[in-house]
Amino acid sequence: MTIQLHNTTRRALPEAKLKKAVRLVLSEEGGKAVSIDAIYCGGRMMRRINREFLGHDYDTDTVTFPYSEGLVVEGEFYVSLDEVGRNAVRFKSGFEQELLRVTIHSVLHLLGYDDASPEERGRMRQKEDRYLRILGAGVSSTEERSQV
């Protein structure tokens, strides 16, 4: 199992905790990672990726690229540290908690979960909350999150 973290910013990241979060989600969901690249970047890079690959010209917290289907996981995901910071303020959570949440969310996408409908978003949010609790990261209020 290969999990590579890449930080394109100058901000220090809790790499051990991030890898632990990735492994936890994979283990609990029955997944096996062949290769996962997690790229933590700034807002400009994320917006460019979102526009170039998805045709969306706006900021987002994560973009995932699954290269496999099912529980054998190969893929990459990008996380905008700028957007994580904004979300941490918006949802009154700490930066690290929000970073872990978005990382968990990204791995769930690699495993095939979607968040296109309110029901799907709710299901993913419940899983994120569960994994944050297991990691000891706590959970911020999810009332406002249910709207996004």
Swiss-Prot record:
Localization (cell): Cytoplasm
This protein's record includes keyword Nuclease: yes
Signal sequence region: none
UniProt cofactor note: Binds 1 zinc ion.
Matching Pfam families: YbeY (PF02130)
EC number: 3.1.-.-
UniProt: Zn(2+) binding residues: H105, H109, D115
Protein name (database record): Endoribonuclease YbeY
Originating species: Chlorobium phaeovibrioides (strain DSM 265 / 1930)
Lineage, highest ranks first: Bacteria, Pseudomonadati, Chlorobiota, Chlorobiia, Chlorobiales
Name of the coding gene: ybeY
